[in-house]
Amino acid sequence: MRILHISDLHVEPAPEERLPGLMASLDRDRDPLRRVGADLMIVSGDLTTYGSSRPEHLALAREWLDGLDVPYLAVPGNHDLGPSPDRGARSPVQEAYEDVPYGRTGYGRTFGTDPVEVRDLGQLRVVGFGVREDDPDGVLPRLAETLAADTRPVILVGHYPLVPTRDPKPHEEFGSEAFVPRTGAALLDLIRRQPNVRLYACGHVHVTSVRPLAPHCTQVTAGSLGQGASTYRVYDVDSSGLTYATALGAGPLGFWHTVDPNLSGEFSLGTGTERSGRLIW
């Protein structure tokens, strides 16, 4: 079983406001992504930069994903589904908060009205979710019920890392604490109580990282395919575990160097063991 993990595309129509040339770069990624031969592609959020306030950008992201002709499961990030009224007030264009049920948000209308999605792949389950601060959509109890209903190994797909990926942080908003602090803590507690959750696949921080979440679960981030560090993950799953590898995309190889030019390439692209290895379950 092969799973392709991409994240943080940050799609916006050309000519792009944030990163000129981004869509051309993403289009150069199309053929390499198809050649992976994935049974499923997971997309761990921030499909857009301005989608929370400009739903037509979400439609463009869906068009791009559909055009790959690879089965996929996508979840929203903070730029697709504003995480809280506070974030919406701080960033009304990039993280607009929609005080409506999930299914009536721009993301829900574009990608599906259910914030929890399941794909059954033989002896493996893939569960994706979109979450907002204080869980107005009731995602956490749904997840608990879904995870408890089956004993097969689970790859859980969300947007926000639940434990730090780099220390020290290059910026106060590096990580999830500024976005979903209470809900993130509750989600981490939930995962630690569910021994069948073997991998938590996420994005958000634009780095390639691997961190333990619990004795039974590992957190893996993919870089930002669109804005950098432009990487994607390939997971080969068998009955005893998962082998992970990392490939470079066509976009920039770094993102946080604009904040701190002294950051190493390893900060963005990960160590050797973060880029490839095996997880046993």
Language model features with spans:
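Active-site-proximal beta-strand elements of phosphoester/diester hydrolases
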Residues: 1-13, 123-132, 155-157, 217-224, ...
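Divalent metal-coordination and catalytic microenvironments
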Residues: 8, 41, 46, 61, ...
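Extended active-site neighborhood of metal-dependent phosphoesterases/phosphodiesterases
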Residues: 56-148, 215-218, 234
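His/acidic metal-ligating clusters that form di-metal
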Residues: 29-41, 125-127, 134-218, 268-281
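Active-site environment of divalent metal-dependent phosphoester hydrolases
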Residues: 12-15, 49-53, 74-86, 115-117, ...
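N-terminal active-site segment of His-dependent metallophosphoesterases
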Residues: 1-58, 148-149
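Binuclear metal-dependent phosphoesterase catalytic core
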Residues: 208-281
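Short, flexible/disordered intra-domain loops and linkers
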Residues: 14-22, 54, 84-98, 167-179
